[in-house]
Amino acid sequence: MDMVKVKINGIEVEVPAGSTILEAAYKAGIDIPTLCYLKDINEIGACRICVVEVKGMRGMVTACVYPVADGMEVFTNTEKVQKARKMNLELVLSTHNQDCLGCVRSGDCELQKLAKDYGIKDTKAWSGMNMEWPVDESAAHMYRDNSKCILCRRCVAACGVTQGIGVIGANERGFETHIASAFEQPLDSTSCVSCGQCIVVCPTGAIAEKDDTDKVWAALADPTKHVVVQTAPSIRATLGECFNMPIGTNVQGKMVAAARRLGFDKVFDTDFAADLTIMEEATEFLHRFTEGGTLPLITSCSPGWVKYCETYFPEFIPSLSSCKSPQQMFGAVAKTYYAQKMGLDP
């Protein structure tokens, strides 16, 4: 592999030919801010927050897409670069819904963090075109609010490149450009499989999970309700990271105690329903194997996978197990067997 030497802020670094300035900077331990960049997935230079100066060039270049050359000298933190990044951020914010207090991503928003880092207090210098976009709440699990979209196209890449679905894309041009499905269809009318990857990569609150916290509090406060909760096996080993604990810390005891203190009457582990799933799927497999049913038998543990199969590979539907997912099985058990055992009216 051919290697080239690049100097970034006076630090010499050797990287493979064809690397971008951003990749070279990371190797040199130099941070360059980005908003639209996702390595190998979304490298389009759309946000222009990663602009840098290159010695001998008149204008600035976007570090996420511009390739390095042997002997290149790059400057990432000059006054000119800082002013350009700040102006680009102000322009993005001038057309952005700045209702941060009511945004689900407040405090965990990449745009908000960069605005703070660059000392942006207002956008009075610019009069952006603030379009009125309807909020799409048609899907059961998520909503889309284009007034908070910065057109980074991360969600488009996650849907099309990572997942291979391609439900959403950039519609219209100019100030009317926005992310939407084909023919502006609501999300529940598309072939979206509810994978949630667009939510994961969105840097703002433009795409987010629906929040049922208020409904949970209402249920906990209702003296006529017996409220139970189930926790997935993975949560006990991942929840601790949200509280800066080492990766993999088992917080099951703390989690159960916290749920009980919140007011839940019972806390159950979905492990139990996973055992039921194993027994049900094994029984179904034996029945198909001995009675001549459709093989192979494919698990149906993930509703998202089932929807993906039904939408894109309907020819495999006969191979899907008829069993519910562990989460769904527990819901059924809680409202039947458990309710009867406890003398409750579900």
Predicted features by range, described:
Residues 4, 17-77, 81, 210-346:
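Iron-sulfur-associated redox domains of electron-transfer enzymes in respiratory
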Residues 163, 202, 338-342:
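Structural motif corresponding to the C-terminal cap of alpha-helices
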Residues 20, 110, 144, 154, ...:
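Short Gly/charged-rich anion-binding patches and loops
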Residues 1-11:
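Eukaryote-biased recognition of intrinsically disordered, low-complexity regulatory segments
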Residues 9-19:
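Short, contiguous acidic and Ser/Thr-rich linear segments
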Residues 48-194, 200, 207-208, 212-226:
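Fe-S ferredoxin-like electron-transfer domains
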